Amino acid sequence: MARIAGVNIPTNKRVLIALQYIHGIGQKNAAEILEKVKIADDKRVNQLSDQEVLQIREVIDRDYMVEGDLRRETGMNIKRLMDLGCYRGLRHRRGLPVRGQRTHTNARTRKGPAKSIAGKKK
């Protein structure tokens, strides 16, 4: 099992798919990485040489923000919005949808389970 960017990527999958197990690398970025390193995207992880794994690791470390660094930056961006007190920051602080969705009904994922109200029986 190859370890890239602190993540054990599965050995029996294609490299294009396996790279997507790393937080911050999707389909497009995985294809870009393989193109830079000149590895066929239909090759499996267990067929990679140690040199190829090392090249992939170097490209990711040099050109992409992944895993902990990406999570930290995302968290810092949200914290910055909350500290500014702007509308988006207030929505984050209150645990409500940030991007203009309705909240009269729905928004249960963001708001959590429905709270029952006493005296609403018919």
From Swiss-Prot:
Record bears the keyword NAD: no
Keywords from the UniProt entry: Ribonucleoprotein, Ribosomal protein, RNA-binding, rRNA-binding, tRNA-binding
Start and end residues of each stretch annotated as Disordered: 95-122
Pfam family, one: Ribosomal_S13
GO biological process, one term: translation
The keyword Ribosomal protein belongs to this UniProt entry's keyword annotation: yes
PROSITE patterns in UniProt: RIBOSOMAL_S13_1, RIBOSOMAL_S13_2
Sample GO molecular function, one term: structural constituent of ribosome
GO cellular component, one term: cytosol
Domain of life: Bacteria
Annotated family: Belongs to the universal ribosomal protein uS13 family.
Functional note: Located at the top of the head of the 30S subunit, it contacts several helices of the 16S rRNA. In the 70S ribosome it contacts the 23S rRNA (bridge B1a) and protein L5 of the 50S subunit (bridge B1b), connecting the 2 subunits; these bridges are implicated in subunit movement. Contacts the tRNAs in the A and P-sites.
Oligomer and partners: Part of the 30S ribosomal subunit. Forms a loose heterodimer with protein S19. Forms two bridges to the 50S subunit in the 70S ribosome.
PANTHER family: 30S RIBOSOMAL PROTEIN S13/40S RIBOSOMAL PROTEIN S18, SMALL RIBOSOMAL SUBUNIT PROTEIN US13M
Protein name according to UniProt: Small ribosomal subunit protein uS13
Organism: Rhodopseudomonas palustris (strain BisB18)
Organism classification: Bacteria, Pseudomonadati, Pseudomonadota, Alphaproteobacteria, Hyphomicrobiales
